[in-house]
Amino acid sequence: MANERPAQQSDIKLLISKGLEQGYLTYAEVNDHLPDDLVDPEQIEDIISMINGMGIDVHEVAPDAETLLLNDGNTGNREVDDTAAEEAAAALTALDTEGGRTTDPVRMYMREMGTVELLTREGEIAIAKRIEEGLSQVQAALGVFPLSTEMLLADYEAHKEGKKRLAEIVVGFNDLIEEADAAAAALAAAGPVAVSDDEAVDEDDDEDGDDEAAEEEAGPTGPDPVEVATRMENLANEYAKFKKVYAKNGAEHKLVVKAREDMAAIFTTLKLPLPLTDALVTQLRGVVNGIKDHERKVLHLATTVARMPRKDFIRSWEGNQTNLEWVEDALKRKQKWSSALRDVKDQIISEQQGSIEMEKANYLTLGEIKEISRAMAYGEAKARKAKKEMVEANLRLVISIAKKYTNRGLQFLDLIQEGNIGLMKAVDKFEYRRGYKFSTYATWWIRQAITRSIADQARTIRIPVHMIETINKLNRISRQMLQQFGREATPEELAKEMDMPEDKIRKVMKIAKEPISMETPIGDDEDSHLGDFIEDTNVESPIDNTTNINLSETVRDVLAGLTPREAKVLRMRFGIDMNTDHTLEEVGKQFDVTRERIRQIEAKALRKLRHPSRSEQLRSFLDID
């Protein structure tokens, strides 16, 4: 494909040059220069339109001289621009081959990925701020939802009891972050500060320690537990005050609204971890779904069962979700559906009472809950869109890292998929204030996701990650010792080098062996498989099988030389061609004689078989082990 494209461009360049020179082209000439696999009429029309846009007319047949003279009279006087012809040829070739490149999923992925521009440091910061704004809007919405505060306080109580870590509840303080941002902005607006030569020298000397300082800053120290305890205590006090005011005045009183705002002001100063935020969002969404469930049931009863027009229902229902007199008010209108509505009155009131109970349980009106849900959804959508942009702009980074892990048991597309999962985790945890680029931070998450997936999925029998790391270390040291001594290292030498017990080294070496498929091709022609060369101990060997068949045939031939009675007695006594052998008593009953007589017949038959003329045929089988 790569070798064909330059040739196609050259042919199309000549075609365009010819068209510019003579002022026209025929459909036959254009068709001769198009790829054979291009059959889409729309693409062919696009190519014709592009040629027409260059000032070249396309005709069914070549026009005569008079027609050309009537069309601007410039036949043969067009200047052929080689650069324009090359650009047009490249564009047409790209268009021609577009259809042939859409069947391969890898090519499609790469092409779509390449359409997204790379981000600069400023672009990364801008997107990170949008993500932060979206999450802040989500937390602001959760802050005015009282049950979110209740869950947060319950989790903090679990932390005090030792059931949860503090990092699972609070990871920082939003107000302190905003103050630091404001201070940094003021410092940047003030311009560069003049420093003395001595200070400049000191800064140069400290450059070597910048990396260590950055690493130290990047280390998660966590919020101050004392400060967290103080804010949690204040939040608990505000929550108790809110519940007291609510119990006295109801949800819509201005004192209740003020108490809820005071509670939300403290709630939003706490920076919550993503898992806890997701749990709070799920809780609010569950409440909203419960409200919608009640409303859907009322809608079904009123419009489907009672046949109330949907427009009438929506117009009268809005604002009356918890008004238990709504059905009576609707019945007073005395419409043709009134009788059916009266039949479902009790069911509708039951659903309304369910909505009222939800209002009481959540300390909010239905309208307030829906408004909070809308604000939360808006923030989620904003953060989700920004995260999507950040991920799409860094997909190339995943490709470059995944290439280093090919041929390790996973397909390339699987490696890309796992790397993309790591990239999305990096987007969730990226903190632009620390000063490093996103790619620097994301590389670690992508690499970890890929290596973990290889450890979990590449082997037929899964090995724990810590054992995979030990195996990799063992293999690395084995290669080093092979290069050093020119021979394979012994388990004793490896145990000494790795500072591990020798029996554990042998165990790791045994675990490191990978299973191999029995369908693995063997030989240059690959017409046989490994399983063909493995002995099946459950099946009789061909030699033993052949020997047994020959022995059976020989025994039958020898017995044929005896009398029928003697042959049958021996067959029954030794179980020849029978399921089991028989006792003298059983054989005697068969022949209606005594057991002594059967013993005599058996002894006589065996004496006959010992004769050299007969025994020689059987003696050869005794030599076979």
Curated annotation (Swiss-Prot):
Query: What keyword terms does UniProt attach to this protein?
Result: Cytoplasm, DNA-binding, Sigma factor, Transcription, Transcription regulation
Q: Where is the signal peptide?
A: none
At which residues is the DNA-binding region annotated?
A: 584-603
Region (Sigma-70 factor domain-2) spans which residues? 390-460
In this chain, the stretch annotated as Disordered covers: 194-226
Question: Where does the record place it?
Answer: Cytoplasm
Q: Which GO terms describe its cellular component?
A: cytoplasm
Give GO terms for biological process. DNA-templated transcription initiation
Question: Keyword Transcription: yes or no?
Answer: yes
Principal location: cytoplasm
GO molecular function annotation: DNA binding; sigma factor activity
Give positions of region: Sigma-70 factor domain-3. Answer: 469-545
**Residue ranges of the region described as Sigma-70 factor domain-4:** 558-611
**Pfam families associated with the record:** Sigma70_ner (PF04546), Sigma70_r1_1 (PF03979), Sigma70_r1_2 (PF00140), Sigma70_r2 (PF04542), Sigma70_r3 (PF04539), Sigma70_r4 (PF04545)
* SUPFAM superfamilies, sorted: Sigma2 domain of RNA polymerase sigma factors, Sigma3 and sigma4 domains of RNA polymerase sigma factors
Residue numbers covered by motif Interaction with polymerase core subunit RpoC: 414-417
Q: Does the keyword Nucleotide-binding apply?
A: no
- Ranges annotated as biased composition (Acidic residues): 196-218
Q: What does this protein do?
A: Sigma factors are initiation factors that promote the attachment of RNA polymerase to specific initiation sites and are then released. This sigma factor is the primary sigma factor during exponential growth.
Q: What protein family is recorded?
A: Belongs to the sigma-70 factor family. RpoD/SigA subfamily.
Subunit architecture = Interacts transiently with the RNA polymerase catalytic core.
According to UniProt, the name of this protein is RNA polymerase sigma factor RpoD
User: Which organism is this protein's natural source?
Assistant: Xanthomonas axonopodis pv. citri (strain 306)
What are the top taxonomic ranks of the organism? Bacteria, Pseudomonadati, Pseudomonadota, Gammaproteobacteria, Lysobacterales
Gene from which this protein is expressed: rpoD
